[in-house]
């Protein structure tokens, strides 16, 4: 088989080609041994009149051809990783701005998401660019050796903080479902920030042994010139403590939350059906009551009879929030599981597994895990209207939501409410006249009914007037 590789290279680039030749000879010694033995037979170098070099390669790929191919691969890798870095930084900055500026998003869960966005943003600022640099240098560490342990520490810290935040969110949602009154009473902004501080403290404690021991002994963070965790104990313990244990807690609490929400929804539906049957019962003949009074009686609620019960609206909101969080959990697990599973396999089957294959898989899977930091803002944009509208305004440099002036609200609202109030008063007068002559059999019952309905109508009128005055 003959492979032909032709390229035009200026004479000024020959020294650079020779330097690349030396690098490639270190990486591919077998190819260069065969080249040295058959140099005169395999290649032909000619210089034309325009001082340009034409390279013709037959039967093998010479150093310059190999360097060009590797350079193209590195260019594509650099382009893809640059896109991931930009998406990670920009998207998470938008999330931080949205939670900070939008009052609708200022609750415990979104505070956790903002802290998660800070961890992902720092991962994009401090970890991903260095990882891209190592790719361009053939996975060799190009920076001072002391920075290797610091870089691994930051990588483990922010990755651990991400899953710890998701685990804390899952636990917090489960507690909110189980004890809604207690959770709403004691879950203030200060409590939420204390929980976030606890999450970061745990993440720092898990990742701190890396710089402590790595700065003392380079062999724990260097392997054949590459910056990576070379200590098997670090790999095993770190993988279980920083990923698999929080993952188990997160999955269990999430499914318990879904089960509790389904139970709450079933109870709420049964309560509504029971209330509908009881409220539809009346001591008065339907002929003696107007349709408006029947409607008022059917929706009349006894105060405090269902205190502490969750409404269908709150359950629906919880289900929507769990749906979005479930997607975030699922994507995080799917994107990080391959890396940690391969990491465990590299330690367990060190002798039977091919180290080159394991290393190549880890290099790919770690960037798939990094990609999860860029995906979260996209999930919020797709499934949350408040985030979506906030992001669109921030991209247009509009940091405050445009609201209608109070005068327009008064002009549009007061006439409608005043009209409804007048109609209600007219209807009350007509109904009182119609019910003024009851039959003898229903006299006592109708009198009580009229008193009750008049009180209800009066309350409704007062409520409407209060709304008008408040607006």
Curated annotation (Swiss-Prot):
InterPro entries: 5HT2A_rcpt, 5HT_rcpt, GPCR_Rhodpsn, GPCR_Rhodpsn_7TM. Residues 1-80, 138-146, 216-232, 349-356 are extracellular. Pfam families: 7tm_1 (PF00001). Keywords: Behavior, Cell membrane, Cell projection, Cytoplasmic vesicle, Disulfide bond, G-protein coupled receptor, Glycoprotein, Membrane, Phosphoprotein, Receptor, Synapse, Transducer, Transmembrane, Transmembrane helix. The record marks 229 as: Hydrophobic barrier that decreases the speed of ligand binding and dissociation. It is found in: Cell membrane; Cell projection, Dendrite; Cell projection, Axon; Cytoplasmic vesicle. Its main location: membrane. Serotonin binds at residues 155, 343. Disulfide bonds join 148-227, 349-353. It is a multi-pass membrane protein. Detected in neurons in brain cortex. Detected in adult intestine, especially in mucosal epithelium, longitudinal and circular layers of muscularis externa and myenteric plexuses. Highly expressed in Paneth cells, and detected at lower levels in enterocytes (at protein level). Detected in neurons in the brain cortex. GO terms for molecular function: 1-(4-iodo-2,5-dimethoxyphenyl)propan-2-amine binding; G protein-coupled serotonin receptor activity; Gq/11-coupled serotonin receptor activity; identical protein binding; protein tyrosine kinase activator activity; protein-containing complex binding; serotonin binding; serotonin receptor activity. G-protein coupled receptor activity is regulated by lipids: oleamide increases HTR2A-mediated activity. A motif (DRY motif) lies at residues 172-174. One of its GO terms (biological process) is positive regulation of neuron apoptotic process. The chain crosses the membrane at residues 81-97, 112-137, 147-171, 192-215, 233-258, 323-348, 357-382. One of its GO terms (cellular component) is presynaptic membrane. The modification Phosphoserine is found at residue 280. Disruption phenotype: Mutant mice display increased exploratory behavior in open spaces and reduced anxiety-like behavior. Mutant mice fail to show behavorial responses to psychoactive substances and hallucinogens, such as mescaline, psilocybin, 1-(2,5-dimethoxy-4-iodophenyl)-2-aminopropane (DOI), 1-(2,5-dimethoxy-4-bromophenyl)-2-aminopropane and lysergic acid diethylamide (LSD). Besides, the colon from mutant mice does not contract in response to 5-hydroxytryptamine. SUPFAM superfamilies: Family A G protein-coupled receptor-like (SSF81321). Signal peptide: none annotated. The PDZ domain-binding motif is involved in the interaction with PATJ, CASK, APBA1, DLG1 and DLG4. Interacts (via C-terminus) with MPDZ and PATJ. May interact (via C-terminus) with MPP3, PRDX6, DLG4, DLG1, CASK, APBA1 and MAGI2. Interacts with GRM2 and DRD2; this may affect signaling. PANTHER family: 5-HYDROXYTRYPTAMINE RECEPTOR, 5-HYDROXYTRYPTAMINE RECEPTOR 2A. This is 5-hydroxytryptamine receptor 2A. It comes from Mus musculus. The lineage of its organism: Eukaryota, Metazoa, Chordata, Craniata, Vertebrata. The gene is Htr2a.
